[in-house]
């Protein structure tokens, strides 16, 4: 049974609030340090402001000038506005530079269409006429364009698996994310007794595979959509609803450690060597 849309929206808001707060706490250390940092052997004083923005661009995996940011202090002053635009709330939302409103809506529709059509081609024959994208996921896709997880972008991109890379096809063509039941059995790593009729891999990352699988435990059970995560460090996680996924995923591989200013290095941060 699908979750009510209001429950999905509330769980997403709680997820975003938690991750935003954690990232803001880290940026309250990084931003003031970078705003006054001066590298060794600076040849031109006029370059330092550009270096500071470059360092923040690397930390946040973005181009701050595209967002109208010209001074490091604006990141904290405008945090609530900027967080969803650069993924500091753990989501991906397409921005204006990625197309007009109509073009972005078309990208979203294309993602769902291609996934569903591929499911009907690659799933077990006895479910091909009835299989469709789970309503929970469709509701989530109406609110954001991706769910990418915990941490500042530069660190998250290296070490944190994304639950859903989103509507972009630059990482992998959408149809390529949909797998045959045989391939999903290995990818999702469900117990051998489980049966998989179809599904897809919305996201992945270091030592972790996310899967959305149409599955059942035995012939007597009905087919259900489930969200799974198979990892080396956390084993296998199985969820039946998006609110459960978001509540767990918000804390997945969470680290509360924030460096002190004395642990930061100006050259490393300003020259994008993080």
Predicted features and spans:
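Exposed regions on extracellular, virion, or secretory-pathway luminal proteins
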Residues: 123-127
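Hydrophobic alpha-helical bundle cores within soluble ligand-binding/oligomerization subdomains
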Residues: 138-141
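A C-terminal-region feature
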Residues: 1-122, 143-274
């Amino acid at each position: 049974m699908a979750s009510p849309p209001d429950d999905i929206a509330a769980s997403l808001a709680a997820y975003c609030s938690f991750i935003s707060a954690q990232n803001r706490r880290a940026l309250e250390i990084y931003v003031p340090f970078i705003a006054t940092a001066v590298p060794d052997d600076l040849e031109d004083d006029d370059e330092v402001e550009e270096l500071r923005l470059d360092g923040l661009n690397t930390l946040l995996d973005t181009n701050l000038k595209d967002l109208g940011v010209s001074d490091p202090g604006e990141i904290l002053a405008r945090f609530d506005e900027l967080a969803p635009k650069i993924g500091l709330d753990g989501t991906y939302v397409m921005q204006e530079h990625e197309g007009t409103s109509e073009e972005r809506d078309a990208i979203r529709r294309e993602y769902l269409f291609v996934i569903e059509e591929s499911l009907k081609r690659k799933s077990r024959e006895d479910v091909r006429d009835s299989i469709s994208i789970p309503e929970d996921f469709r509701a989530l896709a109406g609110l954001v364009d991706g769910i990418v997880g915990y941490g500042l972008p530069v660190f998250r991109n290296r070490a944190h698996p994304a639950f859903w890379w989103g509507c972009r096809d630059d990482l992998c063509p959408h149809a390529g994310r949909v797998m045959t039941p045989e391939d999903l059995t290995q990818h999702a790593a469900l117990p051998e007794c489980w049966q998989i009729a179809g599904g897809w891999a919305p996201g992945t990352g270091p030592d972790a595979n996310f899967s959305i699988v149409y599955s059942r435990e035995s012939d007597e059970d009905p087919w259900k959509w489930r969200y799974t995560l198979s990892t080396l460090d956390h084993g296998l996680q199985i969820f039946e609803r998006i609110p459960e996924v978001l509540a767990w995923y918000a804390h997945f591989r969470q680290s509360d450690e924030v460096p002190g200013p004395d642990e930061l290095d100006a050259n490393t941060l300003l020259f994008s060597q993080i």
